[in-house]
From Swiss-Prot:
Pfam families: LptD (PF04453), LptD_N (PF03968). It comes from Pseudomonas aeruginosa (strain LESB58). This is LPS-assembly protein LptD. Component of the lipopolysaccharide transport and assembly complex. Interacts with LptE and LptA. GO terms for biological process: Gram-negative-bacterium-type cell outer membrane assembly; lipopolysaccharide transport. The gene is lptD.
């Protein structure tokens, strides 16, 4: 919150009337003082006042004030009334230092003196700014000058009061009754005031309020320096409106630059009637210009009980970043024992920062992780690193293991100019067991491999060129070493002219696939075999490396109307390979009856005719008007067969069948296999759209009709491969490929929205040839737009048509019984009352009769603090030996405490699994922010 300091004039040219008046210092104006004096500005800038002849000599009675007031006018236990009688003073105002940091109810029973508005009196717009668990909000009232941004030396001074008196000899103006002083954005109010012209000082007594941009200070007595805006308010309470923060102090001082100093001050985000937590310090400083506060000899109190002491603390008073400790987290697992992480954040500059993560692990020692982030006008990125001298000896004899365990990485995106873009994503780890043994706070995307990629892209008007170098480092010992692309060059685009509406486009690629296979046999101390990498089991063409060039020119003629379209397409697909095969690969070619040719090419035409129609009508369902669409689509695809069994597979797989598969040009991903096709895809989509554009429901269904068997397959899935494997092992349970059927499974995809809060989506694939469901899923999601705190997810997934890569053979195979997916996933966040919610998730695998993850707990949330307590069970993966991947169950109890305005105290790790496990959790938290 930026606050501009207020500077009063050196000479305070007072203008007093019975209402609000203004005066510029150079103006020679006539002044009247509430029918008491006739005052004029003298030549020296002082006052020249004389009593009016018919003036009433009596001012309204002076308000009685507390014994704590510094004003001499209010001192003593009694005052004299107009008739000379003695009037007893009102009961002594309670000191804020005696209230334990709570707001003084004696000033107003409903805390309106702090601009507190209860929830039931807030407007709809104001309610949208607070959580459902908040009982109200601090609302700054609209007042003249509150948004005044003019320089203080150019701002006039305004004074108003019900009555006034001026002592010319002492040059003191006395004001009484609803006194208001305002200059620029600063305003001071009180029951009465004395303005000392010689000292440029004002003294206000009774119900004092000092307002500045977004801040209010309330007290019994105030001293204001009129030439620079300094002020002191005694027995003070304060509010920072936007931060929803308040506090109190023996006295509060406002400096010339609008910094607030509190003596024996408190700070909290709790509501006026509550003190769940309070930060108390001998000297507290609040700087609205920077958004931070400091406190010395500070004590954190929870329910008035001291729980933490620090000689100095630096804390935020708004949402701006600051250096300091972040919420620590602790846990206990079998791998690390008790773990404590105490992150420290460095706010180095507006465009770069750093975070240090000291991680103490009882079983492994002290690990240091660090992250540096930067942002410039043309680039952004992250640099991270970690180091641990591991004292755990569990993997002491494992290959590729060292007690010095480390990680370093760089992510960078740089726009060299409007057309050139450079990207780097490089991470390296010390050993393949790193993520199995150690947690990380560095945001690594995968725990089975790390990416090592650099890309340079140029975007022209009609083309895009890209130079890419990409490698991977495995973080497991049970997978085959992946291929590296060193380099990969692509050039894609279209011709700028379209003769007769014909569009010409092209796609080109050159890539070098390489990898270093690990064929070593690792031995135990006694000389026996300990294990081998999966690389050692690769045979034949699976051990190939080489270059691949792919050219794909094409032309199409889109013909589009409002009622439909027809687009014929013709492409030419040419691929050339220059291959290498090591000696072990050549020796084992006969294993799968393969042939190696170092130079191969493949050329194929592709013909596609895509067409669709669009129909719509107005209809009524359940009393609601809809626009229903009917969108039939047909696509014919022809690609001739060409034998590709002796071409190795570098980056190709076959995605699972779905409704989107109907419209693919190639049933394989990657370019090492181009599927033969002579087929017609038919599909239809219908939608129900309301008059406001809201799509209530959609349903799509379709099927492919084959005019020829699909002969091109991945290694291990062709009829020849399956026959060869059966001949070697007649008892082998192998699934027959569905390549000679004249039709595909029926593919369905649908979505229905009960309203904007409830929706269900589903996909379903049923094979009429086997009368079996090959895959399907149904997902239900509930999250109201106006109350995203309510979240319900329920889903079920089934799939038995998967294909997987077998690292022990280096070939693909159909999923076996153990690979069938039958899982349900249920998660919920539900408020029981505005402040209490339950959180839970249960993910279960019916095929293996086991729980994959389950957690449950509760959350308490208020305007000033939050608590979560969650019990969690989950499966972890651990490589104890080559080709031996063990799954083990972990359990943990996670506690998270957040003191709003100070940040979390413990347990930020809960955020990670809640965000990953519950769809809608992030939207809920973003709305709360």
């Amino acid at each position: 919150m930026a606050v501009k300091s207020l500077v009063f004039r050196r000479k305070f040219p007072l203008l007093v009337t019975g209402s609000l008046l203004a005066l510029q210092p150079v103006a020679a104006l006539t002044v009247q003082a509430a029918d008491q004096f006739d005052c004029k500005v003298s030549a020296t800038g002082g006052w020249d006042c004389s009593p009016l002849q018919n003036a009433n000599a009596n001012l309204p009675p002076r308000p009685a004030h507390t014994a704590t007031s510094v004003s001499t006018a209010a001192a003593g236990s009694s005052v004299s009334g107009s008739g000379g009688e003695t009037v007893e003073a009102e009961p002594t105002q309670r000191l804020v230092t005696e209230s334990g940091g709570r707001a003084l109810k004696s000033r107003s029973a409903d805390y309106s003196h702090l601009d507190w508005i209860p929830r039931e009196k807030l407007t709809a717009a104001q309610l949208a700014e607070i959580g459902p668990y908040c009982g109200g909000s601090y609302i700054e009232p609209v007042r003249p000058g509150m948004d005044d941004g003019a320089p203080s030396d150019e701002s006039p001074t305004y004074v108003s009061a019900k009555a006034s008196r001026y002592e010319q000899e002492k040059q003191i103006a006395t004001l009484a009754g609803d006194v208001v002083l305002r200059q620029g954005s600063m305003q001071v109010e009180g029951d009465e005031a004395n303005l000392h012209q010689l000292e440029n000082r004002g003294e206000l007594v009774g119900n004092v309020k000092l307002r500045d941009k977004g801040m209010l200070v309330v007290g019994d007595h105030a001293q204001v320096q009129l030439d620079n805006g300094e002020a002191q308010v005694d027995n003070a309470e304060y509010v920072i409106h936007k931060a929803h923060a308040r506090g109190s102090a023996l006295y509060a001082k406002r400096s010339e630059n609008a910094i607030i100093m509190l003596k024996d001050g408190t700070y909290t985000r709790c509501e006026p009637s509550s003190n769940a937590w309070t930060l108390k310090g001998n000297n507290v400083k609040l700087n609205p210009a920077t958004g931070f506060g400091t406190a010395t000899n500070a004590t954190l109190r929870v329910k008035d009980f001291p729980v933490f002491y620090t000689p100095y603390i630096y804390f935020p008073i708004d949402d701006r970043r600051q250096s300091g400790f972040l919420p620590p987290s602790f846990s206990s697992t079998s791998d690390t024992g008790f773990t404590l992480v105490t992150p420290y954040y460095f706010n180095l500059a507006p465009n770069y920062d750093a975070t240090l993560y000291p991680r103490y692990m009882a079983k492994r020692g002290m690990m240091l992780e660090g992250e540096f982030r930067y942002l410039t006008h043309s680039s952004e990125g992250t640099v991270n690193a970690a180091y641990l001298n591991d004292k755990d000896d569990h993997r002491e004899n494992f290959p590729d293991y060292s007690k010095d365990r480390w990680l370093y990485g760089l992510k960078n995106t740089t726009g060299l100019d409007s057309r050139w873009l450079a990207e780097v994503d490089y991470t390296r780890i010390s050993d393949p067991y790193y993520f199995q043994d150690l947690d990380t706070d560095l945001g690594v995307g995968s725990t089975t491999y790390v990416n090592q990629r650099g890309t340079l892209t140029y975007r022209g008007d009609t083309f895009t060129g890209r130079l890419n170098a990409q490698a991977y480092q495995l973080a497991t010992t049970t997978d085959v070493t992946p291929y590296e692309r060193l380099p990969q060059i692509t050039f894609d685009g279209f011709l700028p002219y379209e003769p007769g509406g014909v569009k010409f486009n092209y796609s080109t690629e050159f890539v070098r696939f390489d990898r270093d296979l690990d064929d070593n046999i690792y031995l135990n101390d006694d000389g026996s075999e300990w294990g081998r990498r999966p690389d050692a089991y690769l045979q034949g063409l699976a051990r190939s490396t080489g270059d691949r060039v792919h050219l794909e020119p094409g032309m199409s003629l889109p013909m589009t109307r409002s009622w439909g379209y027809l687009t014929p397409t013709l492409k030419y697909l040419y691929t050339k390979y220059d291959l290498d095969l090591d000696s072990q690969g050549k020796r084992t070619l006969t294993t799968y009856d393969e042939t190696f040719d170092s130079s191969q090419d493949r050329s194929l035409p592709l013909v596609k005719v895509d067409s669709g129609l669009y129909f719509d009508r107005d209809t009524t369902l359940a009393g609601t008007q809809f626009r229903q669409t009917l969108e039939p689509r047909a696509m014919y695809l022809y690609v001739p067969y060409k034998d590709q069994e002796n071409i190795p597979v570098f980056d190709t797989s076959e995605p699972s069948f779905s409704y989107d598969s109907l419209w693919r040009e190639n049933r394989f991903s990657g370019r090492d296999r181009i599927g033969d096709a002579n087929q017609l895809s038919l599909g239809v989509t219908t939608r129900f759209i309301e008059s406001n554009g809201f799509e209530r429901a959609s349903l799509s269904a379709g099927q492919i009709y084959y005019f020829r068997d699909r002969r091109v397959q991945l290694p291990g899935l062709s009829e020849k491969d399956l026959a060869l494997m059966r001949s070697k092992n007649p008892n082998l349970d192998l699934k027959d490929p569905d390549t000679d059927s004249w039709r595909s499974p029926y593919a369905l995809m649908g979505q229905y929205r009960f309203n904007r809060d409830w929706r269900v989506s589903s996909d379903f694939n049923w094979n009429p040839n086997t009368s079996r469901t090959e895959s399907g899923s149904a997902m239900f999601h509930y999250q109201p737009e106006d109350n995203p705190n309510k979240v319900v997810n329920a889903g079920y997934r089934y799939r038995e048509d998967s294909r997987r890569f077998n690292s022990s053979t280096g070939r693909f195979e159909y999923g076996r019984e153990n690979d069938i997916i039958k899982q349900h996933d249920f998660s919920v966040i539900w408020p029981l009352v505005p402040q209490w919610s339950v959180l839970a998730r249960w993910q279960y695998d019916y095929n293996k009769n086991r729980t994959l993850e389950a957690f449950g707990g509760f959350e308490y949330d208020s305007c000033c603090w939050k608590l979560r307590l969650i019990n969690r069970y989950w499966l972890d993966v651990d490589d104890d030996a080559f080709l031996n991947q063990n799954e083990k169950a972990d359990r943990g109890i996670f506690l998270q405490i957040v003191l709003k305005g100070l940040g979390g105290i413990v347990g930020n790790k809960t955020e990670m699994f809640l965000d990953k496990g519950i769809q809608g959790y992030r939207q809920r938290e973003d709305q709360a922010m």
